[in-house]
């Protein structure tokens, strides 16, 4: 077997030569693979609870992004990395599913607080427990991978 060597490539942006370290690329690829596996797990878990992955993320953002039991549309837009109007639509759809409710602020009635409903809290509790366990498994795999070279799964 021929040992894998580092390669040099020229950066288009700077024109400088950049050394590609194969071990670093393997670690980045392994991290990306594990991240995608976690995201696929999350999507399946959400759908099993009859919510969309985005609705699960919304519930998580309301409950976990701030120290309050509610969040504003702007805070949720930042948490979800979405546009304000996209989050408004997501909140409206979640309201139809009885996952969240909106409360207008006082004295500024334009200020909207988004709260979880009892149903939203129950869905979030079940999904959060599953995700917490999966994060533990992911951390174990990542730690093991940092100590050894990742093996191909043959897929």
Feature map (PLM): residue ranges:
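N-terminal leader segment of winged-helix/HTH proteins
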Residues: 1-49, 97-99, 152-155
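Charged, amphipathic alpha-helical coiled-coil/dimerization segments
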Residues: 13-15, 92-150
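Residues at secondary-structure transition points
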Residues: 22, 26, 53, 71-74, ...
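Pre-recognition alpha-helix immediately N-terminal to the DNA-recognition helix
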Residues: 30, 37, 57-61, 122
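N-terminal helix-turn-helix DNA-binding core of bacterial DNA-binding proteins
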Residues: 40-83
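Short, hydrophobic-biased segments on the C-terminal half of alpha helices
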Residues: 73, 91-92
